[in-house]
């Protein structure tokens, strides 16, 4: 089934009569991407039951690529297409694209921006990115982690279009306490 639960929905006008009677074209990450997996898990409730998918029952299928610029080019050349990729790439290409608000778990329509991502209101399409560290090497990476959790680290994160955790957030504090606990126990 498509994401509206109806296998026969293929036109924008079938979702809303004010939309054109043109094929719904979808573009995004390829199936090897974490973005693809995350988006599918977040948006398709029946995905694991063999229900909703990206391309099932679509005449034009699903245009996918490991290269975000391929998706942007597809969206630019297909005005009735919709696509998805990470916020960082949207920020880099926002002069060519429009980001659509989504209805979050509170029922509000929220557009993606640094504030709504940081405060968690842009859900279910917000996810954390992790730094994984082997505890045996914590002494060697501690200074890097101090930098990553500093204001300078936040500047780097912002400069590439990602949204840093706020130093006052409980998630940031909890994460830093875990780093300190490992250092103190090593």
Can you describe what each PLM-predicted range is?
Residues 1-186:
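Flexible loop/hinge segments at secondary-structure junctions
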């Amino acid at each position: 089934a498509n994401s509206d639960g109806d296998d026969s929905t293929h036109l924008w006008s079938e979702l809303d009569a004010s939309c054109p009677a043109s094929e719904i074209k979808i573009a995004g990450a390829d199936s090897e991407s974490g973005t693809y997996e995350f988006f599918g898990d977040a948006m398709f409730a029946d995905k694991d039951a063999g229900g909703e998918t990206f391309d099932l029952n679509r005449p034009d299928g699903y245009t996918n690529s490991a290269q975000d610029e391929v998706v942007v080019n597809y969206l630019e050349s297909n005005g009735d297409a919709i696509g998805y990729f990470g916020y960082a790439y949207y920020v880099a290409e926002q002069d060519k694209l429009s980001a659509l608000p989504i209805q979050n778990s509170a029922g509000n329509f929220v557009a993606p921006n640094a504030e709504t991502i940081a405060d968690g209101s842009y859900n279910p399409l917000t996810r954390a990115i992790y730094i994984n560290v082997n505890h045996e090497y914590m002494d060697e990476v501690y200074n890097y982690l101090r930098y990553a959790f500093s204001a300078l680290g936040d500047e780097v994160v912002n400069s590439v279009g990602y949204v840093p955790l706020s130093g006052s957030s409980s998630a940031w504090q909890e994460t830093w306490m875990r780093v300190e606990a490992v250092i103190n126990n090593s």
